[in-house]
Every structure is written in structure tokens, then in C-alpha cells.
Amino acid sequence: MRVTDFSFELPESLIAHYPQPERSRCRLLSLEGPTGALTHGTFTDLLDKLNPGDLLVFNNTRVIPARLFGRKASGGKIEVLVERMLDDKRILAHIRASKAPKPGTELLLGDDESIHATMTARHGALFEVEFNDPRPVLDILNAIGHMPLPPYIDRPDEDADRELYQTVYSEKPGAVAAPTAGLHFDEPLLAALREKGIEMAFVTLHVGAGTFQPVRVDTIEDHIMHSEYAEVPQEVVDAVLAAKARGNRVIAVGTTSVRSLESAAQAAKNDLIEPLFGDTQIFIYPGYQYKVIDALITNFHLPESTLIMLVSAFAGYQHTMNAYKTAVEQKYRFFSYGDAMFITYNPQAISERP
């Protein structure tokens, strides 16, 4: 399959630069996987689409202020984007500079350049940086970091983004991008879902900056997926198996929840799904056999991205591309701060190719 098979025309005006004033008031395009039928509504329609006993699986990662500005002690300006926190003193990061720093390079970080750090090693495209500061890394990032808004949100980050670019249930710091399908859930909607008898479980996948990297090969089978840390604890496994046993659906909130659950299913030795604590490089594209997910809540993704490929593998290629064409025609808002989709599984998708 070619990357260009997953391209579509998107007017610049449909890229959302700010979220809706009320999280759950975004539009919702529902796609019935088996038939391709589309219906238009608002996000709170989920209450009518979910049945008592259905299981929603959320990603409880929390976005860290992962973008740092500063300069090398020798003078050149740099921009640092944290990929992951290694421990209380060290990070793994992308560094943008006119000339890549060498190991041993001193860095002065923060708007006032008050934080001293050293680039200690290079690992491929990533740089290992150690802070010369008594505070833990997370405290330093909270003090001097900027929220790492995606590159297509073409504006500087604002103070409000520290909350707007977080899910209301975010708990475990470590992501450099929000699991954006979850941004639409507010406390009243969560309460109403619980009231209806909808079950909830939480995985953790710390979204890395690699999520924004374009696919740089022509043939998607040649693409090497970036690595991200995921946790699928025993209580999530129990909730999934219980939902399946009683004939209810497992509904992933976002592609990161999909990738966490499917990674845990792939690694399982004795059951449908087993606990997972570790890195995943799972790449889901048409032809993939889904093992766990029955329905998916997700935002609208970039053309030619691994995420639109994941959706195509779930709903079927033709149904997905038709839904995106309709979304553009109906002026849905796209990407991280945009509108959402509710998609049910298409069992025929596995045999469909572009």
C-alpha cells in the first residue's frame, strides 16, 4: 500500500487552533463500520450510542510542558522537545539547533537561561540531556517548559493550554502530546455515562513526539513506527475480559488506547489480553486483525498519517476515506482541538485494501 492512498484535500480553515468553549459540545460524526452509514450529531450523543455494561477505555497520561527554549553556552539558539523523562535528572529529547550539539555541550535553558544542563549522549535522532539542578526533571519542566502544541496549531502556546490540552482525568505525567479524543469528555458527561452503567478503565500510553512525524517512505509496509511506553494493568485486563464475557463492547477512547490494548493482546500468551508494562511499536494499518476493540472514539487525523491508517484498518478503507470526504464537505473541525468520530468495527475491513 502506498502512503498517498491515505491522502485527502483539507482546507487550512478546517484546522482547529482552539478547542470548543465547552469540551463535550464538539460535533460527532458517527460511522457504522459494517455499512459505512454516516450520522451527524454532537459529542453528548454518546450517551445514546453506548449500552449499560459497555466498557470505555481511556488513556490517563498527562501532557508535560515539554518544549524548552535556550541556547548553547557557546551562543547558538536551541529548542528542546522532550521525548521522554528517563529519571529525575535526565531526559531524552529532540534538539533543534543550527548545529547539533556534541556530547559535553553545556545548555542554558528557560526564557531567562537560568537552568543549566549538559548534552551527555546521542541516540540516533535523540539527545540525552542531564540537568545540573537539585529539582526533579518534572519540577523543572513545570517551571520553565512550554506546552508542546502540535506543529499544525500555528500559534504560540498560552497559559490556558496547560489545562485545555489535558484530559480532565489525566493523571500520570509523561506525554508530549495529548490523547486528543479524551479532550471532549467533561465531568458532567463522565457522570452521566457512569449513571447509565457504562464501565470505565484506564490505560497509560505516554504519547511521544514521534506521533507527529510524517511517514517518510512510499510504501507503508516499510515504515518503522516510533516507540512509546504503555501500561495495561491487571484491572484493565479484568474489565476487558468481563465486558467480553457478558456480551458488551470494548470502546477505545482514542488511538493511543487502541494501540495499548492491541499491544497487550498481541503480547498475551494464554488469554485474549494480558497485562503489559513496556514499550510498544505497534503499527496498525489495513490488513491488521483487531483482537480487542469493538468501537472507537477518535478525532480527525492528518492526511497520510499512521492514525488514518489505523482507522482504515478498523472501519475499512473506503468507508474511512468517504467519511473524511464528508467531514470536509460538512466543515468538521480537524486535528487535536477539532471534532470527533464514533466508529463501530467493520469485520470486512481486514480483507480490504486501497
UniProtKB/Swiss-Prot annotation:
EC code(s) of this entry? 2.4.99.17
Q: What is its subcellular localisation?
A: Cytoplasm
Functional pathway: tRNA modification; tRNA-queuosine biosynthesis
What InterPro entries does UniProt report for this protein, alphabetically? QueA (IPR003699), QueA_dom1 (IPR042118), QueA_dom2 (IPR042119), QueA_sf (IPR036100)
What Gene3D superfamilies has UniProt attached to this entry?
QueA-like
SUPFAM superfamilies in the cross-refs: QueA-like (SSF111337)
Q: Which GO terms describe its cellular component?
A: cytoplasm
Q: Which domain of life is it from?
A: Bacteria
This molecule's function is given as:
Transfers and isomerizes the ribose moiety from AdoMet to the 7-aminomethyl group of 7-deazaguanine (preQ1-tRNA) to give epoxyqueuosine (oQ-tRNA).
Q: How does it assemble?
A: Monomer.
Q: What is this protein called?
A: S-adenosylmethionine:tRNA ribosyltransferase-isomerase
Q: Which organism is it from?
A: Salmonella gallinarum (strain 287/91 / NCTC 13346)
